[in-house]
Amino acid sequence: MRENQGRVQALDRLRGLLVVLMALDHANYFVARAHSPGEYWGGVFPAYATAAVFLARLVTHPAAPGFFFLMGTGMALFASRRAEQGWAARRIRCRLLLRGALLIGLQLLIVNRAWELTPGGWGLRIYIGVLTALGAAMLVAAWLLDVKPLLLLIPASGLLIATELLTPGVSRWADPFHPILRLLLIPGGTRALWVNYPLLPWLGLTLFGLAFGGWLNRDPTGARRGTLWIGLGALAVFVLLRLGNGFGNIRTRSDGGWIGFLNVVKYPPSLTFVLLTVGFSLVVLRLLFLIEEGTSSSWDPLLVYGSTPLFFYMLHLFLYAGIGRLFAPGGTSAGGMLLYWLLGLAVLYPACVGFRALKRRQNSRSPLRLF
């Protein structure tokens, strides 16, 4: 059976928007060489000389949490569609487990080769990046497909709150934590093992997405309308927690300006980071649901990118790394970086169109449908 029915265009468009923003961040890293240090729980926290430099980083923040949330949502929708086609629960779970393992393998075997092209050298032996955490979260969430959406909110919330409570204080940044703690909870490490995306904090976002996908399956109209109010509510709670400058922030802010207010801890994702980014994405998703009702162009770039996110991800890293090495070996201005970012998107568009067409010609058993 060849298929491409059942896809929710608004989800694909949101995913497409997120990968475009992610590409901006990586163009900044590989081409402009102006990327800030990460927003870690310890160590030196990034400071920004200008609002433009900060905004170039801020607008990309929704990407990572959005990927985990949308992956969970997609898992619920995939399981529902395949069950309607007669797939047994075991077969559905095995398919998801296989894809989770694939994501981990791609990170360690291929994607890390792109990061080795980092300007000035890489130097890390093992890097645990976003695909590793996405794959590990899928391996866990695949066993929770039958849990009711409301019940999923319990472990999802618990994991995010536990992240706040269990993350060490800033003064312990240089402590030699056990590798298992690194992989599960505490970002950082050494050249032998560096973890940006530990499993447990990001698993919480996946479970929120799985719950939303279950809601979308059971009550599509209610779920579509609810995204706006949940998103606005999340943004309101973000403001309250930032004003409180205590629980929910992992590390308190010292800068009283608006940049300091919006400059939140990402590694691991603080509650304020999650509320800000997911709240924004849900508000955008509501707008995309409204747009979906009146448009259906399959050539929309966001739809194209959003229906081939893994292919886009792997290709764009090597593309921008190559652009940086060939055309901007000494870095470039912000304006030049934006031009190279757009050039990269233009190159990626026909490649993603072609890969999408190839996938659509495959039956549901094809390994290509894992990408």
Residue ranges of model-derived segments:
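Alpha-helical transmembrane segments and their immediate juxtamembrane cytosolic regions
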Residues: 1-371
